[in-house]
Regions:
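Active-site-proximal C-terminal subdomain of hydrolase catalytic domains
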Residues: 101, 187-286
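Disordered regulatory segments flanking catalytic cores
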Residues: 52-81, 93, 267-371
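Active-site-proximal beta-strand/loop segments in catalytic clefts of secreted hydrolases
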Residues: 83-87, 117-121, 149-153, 165-168, ...
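Functional beta-strand-loop-alpha-helix junction segments that form "active/interaction loops"
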Residues: 91, 102-144
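Glycine-biased, low-complexity coil/linker segments
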Residues: 7, 14, 18, 30, ...
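Loop/turn elements at helix/coil->beta-strand transitions in domains of secreted/extracellular proteins
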Residues: 76-80, 110-113, 141-146, 182-187, ...
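A short, glycine/acidic-enriched catalytic loop
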Residues: 151-182
């Protein structure tokens, strides 16, 4: 793939206004190793050199390196466990079925192996047993993303939050225990009412947790799950125009739709979705984001939520599929380092900032130059 052919979609991930990690300094100092080794040595085509000459974002160049030198993707098994809860009423049953259908369709496009809990009409009372069995088997696998999506109703009695299955319900505590040994990248989407307590129970490093409500006391039936199912593979939700819709982008799109629904109906908003991907168990509401970047600081000095969720795609784009698992993992780690550095920009001296920035960018250059 040439730099020029890679460029249009490459810009999107880091270049859309207020949605990318832009370093607006105008480029690296001319004496830096990065500038002299790549710019001075003539390793950049004129197309890329123009970006530096015109003081465009360093990120443009970095991403062009990603796409131009990407190797074939290493196939790691990705799994989706889709849990359909007890409907209670026929109307909800139809909604849940439609929502599940959208997830299945998206998972097929993304190449995930799909297991569905809650559709077996012969043994409806065994949903809990089967769910725990499936989770145990999936947790034992060594690699590949694991997605758990819950579509249904939930309850909360002030002590325990539950997701309503057709037989015995599963509690947040039960699910947390089952997932404790998991070392795979994990995504849990809990679309039910009263789902807030699941976020704190399941939160841990390396996980992305989304709940339809911010507490167990938001007990009314939720609409967030319906909108999220529509957004998860919808190009219209792709805020940064990189050819794929991240989990963060889908979360933000669904949240906007929920707010619009209640506004048009003239009703009080009774559900407030949260996203947690930094492991602090607190969660971040959609209002904290401008574009795909959180504009408020996380508590206790933690990194802000949203960075990891913006690196997760149920349906990866064409360029994302070309990256090997190893390259993708290294890229994600470097992106997180850059984000952390960006947060400290006002606290450190400019020279120190550029020195640290240069180290990270050199790592990126070596990663894609095969050194």
């Amino acid at each position: 793939m040439s730099f020029i052919s890679a460029a249009p979609k490459a810009f999107g991930r880091f270049w859309s206004a207020e949605a990318c990690f832009r370093f607006q300094s105008g480029g690296l100092p001319p004496h830096s190793k990065f500038a002299t080794s790549w710019l001075g040595a003539g390793k950049l085509p004129r197309y890329c050199r123009r970006f530096f000459d015109s003081k465009c974002s360093i990120w443009m160049f970095v991403l062009l390196l990603f796409t131009a030198n990407a190797s074939a993707q290493t196939n790691q098994s990705r799994s989706l466990v889709l849990v359909i809860g007890a409907a209670g009423e026929a109307e909800y049953g139809e909604q849940f079925s439609k929502c599940a259908g959208l997830w299945k369709e998206a998972a097929a496009k993304g190449g995930l192996q799909v297991t569905v809990i809650g559709e077996d009409k012969d043994k409806p009372d065994e949903d809990l047993r089967r769910l725990l069995e499936v989770v145990t088997n999936e947790v034992a696998k060594p690699a590949g993303e694991l997605w758990l999506v819950f579509i249904g109703h939930g309850t909360y009695d002030g002590r325990s939050a539950k997701f309503n299955l057709r037989g015995p319900d599963i509690t947040a505590t039960n699910l947390a225990a089952a997932l404790k040994p998991c070392r795979r990248p994990l995504v849990v989407v809990q679309c039910a009412s009263a789902s807030g307590p699941f976020l704190s129970a399941l939160s841990a490093p390396g996980r992305v947790i989304i709940t339809a409500t911010r507490s167990g006391y938001e007990l009314n039936a939720t609409r967030f799950g319906n909108y999220l199912a529509r957004a998860i593979a919808d190009p219209a939700a792709d805020l940064d125009k990189d050819g794929q819709t991240s989990l963060l982008e889908a979360f933000l799109a669904a949240s906007r739709e929920v707010q619009q629904f209640y506004k048009e109906q003239g009703r009080m908003l009774t559900e407030h979705a949260l996203l947690d991907d930094n492991g602090d168990g607190l969660g971040t509401p959609p209002e904290w984001f401008r574009g795909t970047r959180a504009v408020k600081s996380a508590a206790n000095g933690k990194s802000v939520d949203g960075i990891r969720a913006h690196q997760v795609f149920l349906v990866p784009g064409e360029q994302e599929r070309q990256l090997s698992a190893e390259v993708r993992s290294s890229r994600d780690e470097l992106e997180q380092k850059l984000s952390a550095l960006r947060l400290k920009k006002k606290e450190i001296k400019e020279d120190d900032y550029f020195a640290q920035l240069e180290v990270i960018l050199l790592e990126m250059a070596k990663l894609y130059d095969g050194k």
